[in-house]
């Protein structure tokens, strides 16, 4: 329980209507979840405006409301310029600034965030640390998994989660930090010790508008790093041009990694096979060979980023090497589906042009037969990448099958027609039903072919306008293989 005015001390400026200083027992952004003694934040969403539900929140027990405009209510109304940012600051104080007591590592970038955070988690667990993880796949406190709705949750959920981590004995936490979260201020109040940048390629332009704005949003993580007396570190990809801008934006120590350009963590003599990747790692004064189970040049970048983050967090390089060489993979990331079939099936989360191209190029270098790809694009998301995804699919695969991803409120065939605009040649099919598309790819496969099922990776659902169904690419692929080969 905290007094309202005490919580408001964390805000830079506000106006109070209906003065009062009630006890705050909980904080909410969903009026349906408000209980007696709650503080309700009016948040403007894409389709719903929380200001329209302020009275309902009061009826449910809210004793104060934070809004972006004056409201006629019977409880104190705190008017702020940006209620979402205010919520981040208030939530941080309400939950006792939990990240101040955690070693917090944030990872941002277009691709690779999930893999990098999981690699760091493995290294830290091997050091005997109790870890927490927040990202695309789930929230994890120790070994307990919880479902997440966003890559980076809303600040209210985020700070509550960090408080739960602290209470559970977590000492080190890894978090995927999305550009949406940075732009909207969700991670305000998070005290990052290390911030990692993976790469920057076109994505989310429906939200940010331009690549320059997208880059600026990513850079906010590094701009806010190093604002305290404690030593902070920015881990940047020396092979990505955006890193130069991020280095200028931060006052923290900068450590780099890369393959092509000179870096503090440098991979040399990279050798990729169908079972893994080996390379020589040169890091400061040390040099060693790593042999990892992960496949592809993009995997080397992920490993370098994780190694650098762990190293600046105090883990010796030899122990980092040992942990990384034990990693078998991350769910839905270049994950193979096996059932004694004479061809290879790979499920990958690749849902951006860059990630799809990386996966298909890697597969193309390994394939003895044809490369076939099943791919779609999400509905209600950046439409500009649809023809680009199709162009990449038809350029780097022998055959592409365009199908539904998560259509959401859009008509699936409208999305496929948008994709078709970028297709090269005629070596592609359009099959609206994703299960049917996967079965077709398996049916067409010949010995030594490689099939890539792209876009959904670890996801276990498919979202349509009026329903969400159970759907797992790995399970469907397994069913298709069994039907053909048993």
Curated annotation (Swiss-Prot):
Q: What pathway is this protein a component of?
A: Cell wall biogenesis; peptidoglycan biosynthesis
Could you describe the post-translational modifications of this protein?
Carboxylation is probably crucial for Mg(2+) binding and, consequently, for the gamma-phosphate positioning of ATP.
UniProt keywords, alphabetically: ATP-binding, Cell cycle, Cell division, Cell shape, Cell wall biogenesis/degradation, Cytoplasm, Ligase, Magnesium, Nucleotide-binding, Peptidoglycan synthesis
Q: Which residues carry this modification: N6-carboxylysine?
A: 218
UniProt main location, coarse: cytoplasm
Q: Which residues does the annotation say bind meso-2,6-diaminopimelate?
A: 381, 405-408, 455, 459
Please give the catalytic activity noted in the UniProt record: UDP-N-acetyl-alpha-D-muramoyl-L-alanyl-D-glutamate + meso-2,6-diaminopimelate + ATP = UDP-N-acetyl-alpha-D-muramoyl-L-alanyl-gamma-D-glutamyl-meso-2,6-diaminopimelate + ADP + phosphate + H(+)
Q: Where in the cell is it found?
A: Cytoplasm
HAMAP family to which the protein is assigned, alphabetical: MurE
Give the protein's recorded name: UDP-N-acetylmuramoyl-L-alanyl-D-glutamate--2,6-diaminopimelate ligase
Name the species this protein comes from: Halalkalibacterium halodurans (strain ATCC BAA-125 / DSM 18197 / FERM 7344 / JCM 9153 / C-125) (Bacillus halodurans)
Q: Which gene underlies this protein?
A: murE
